[in-house]
């Protein structure tokens, strides 16, 4: 399964659509800050499941039932999804990774900092921050049991697209 991961879109719908066209994902995760961008993407691509959480800028932009954190199997892999503000990621990712491990996640997805990051911790936990949509995005690939690939896309990767 190929998952496109976006965050902090702040109305960068053109970039988000370019990412969908380039990656051709099986699912999209939107990690908040302009929750309604995720809903608009879902309307544009009804065949692609969109999973999203609310960010700190979404207080008045999202439905009352919107969650700030989700943890469930995506492509056969347990994924912890959050915007990151409640885990205070601007001060480091220690609390984020501890929460992901507490939930038994194999992957921790977060945003909020606008700084892209993709790495694997010593214990095997994948950590992905796609940065700010409009400048970067993340891609997570699984084989139904484990992460097979995790990488970042930048504006440069999408330059050949109209």
Give, region by region, the residue ranges found by the protein language model.
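Active-site neighborhood of phospho(di)ester-bond hydrolases with catalytic His/Asp-centered motifs
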Residues: 5-7, 27-33, 51-56, 80-83, ...
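Binuclear metal-dependent phosphoesterase catalytic core
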Residues: 15-18, 75, 98-104, 121-162
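Pre-active-site segment of Zn-dependent metallo-hydrolases
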Residues: 12-19, 81, 87-100
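Active-site environment of divalent metal-dependent phosphoester hydrolases
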Residues: 10-14, 35-39, 57-62, 87-92, ...
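Helix-adjacent hinge/juxtasegments
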Residues: 49-90
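N-terminal active-site segment of His-dependent metallophosphoesterases
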Residues: 1-47, 58, 62-65, 142-144, ...
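A short helix->loop->beta-strand "cap" motif at the edges of active sites that frequently abuts
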Residues: 46-49, 124-125
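Charged helix-capping and loop-helix junction motifs
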Residues: 65-69, 91-99, 125
């Amino acid at each position: 399964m190929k998952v496109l991961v976006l965050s902090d879109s702040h109305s960068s719908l053109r970039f988000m659509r370019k990412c969908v066209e380039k990656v051709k994902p099986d699912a999209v995760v939107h990690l908040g800050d302009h929750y309604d961008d995720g809903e608009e993407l879902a309307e544009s691509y009804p065949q692609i499941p969109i999973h999203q959480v609310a960010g700190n800028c979404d207080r008045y932009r999202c439905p009352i039932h919107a969650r700030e954190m989700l943890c469930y199997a995506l492509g056969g892999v347990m994924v912890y999804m959050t915007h990151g503000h409640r885990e205070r990621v601007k001060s480091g990712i220690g609390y984020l990774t501890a929460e992901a491990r507490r939930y038994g996640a194999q992957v921790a997805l977060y945003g909020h900092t606008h700084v892209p990051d993709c790495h694997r911790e010593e214990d095997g936990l994948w950590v992905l921050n796609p940065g700010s949509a409009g400048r970067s995005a993340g891609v997570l690939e699984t084989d139904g049991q484990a992460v097979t690939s995790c990488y970042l896309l930048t504006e440069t990767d999408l330059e050949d697209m109209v």
